[in-house]
Amino acid sequence: MSSLREVPGKMFQLAENRQEAGRELRDCVVETLQELMKDDDKITALEADLGGASGFTKIKKTNPERFIQCGIAEANMMGVAAGLSLTGFKPFTHTFAPFATRRVFDQLFLSGAY
């Protein structure tokens, strides 16, 4: 029996009886980054003042030298990430989706691909 329910007049379905995975996605992301950082000293985490929401504060505690707090300046964070990647680092950036679009792509284009 399907756990999806059709919504009359809509192009989507609603999930019912959803089960929780027991872990939040941010915890999986942070744990994976921390594992990767053990084997690769070029991995760097950049944050846009969302440490509590992203879980990146854990990375700041375990790898403070590879954590960069960029503040509420997502476009600038992408410029920093582009510069890091051009010098051999592997930056991972975090921000909320609405702040990682439009102007941020201009910065990526100008700093990393132009």
Report residues per predicted region.
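Thiamine diphosphate
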Residues: M1-Y114
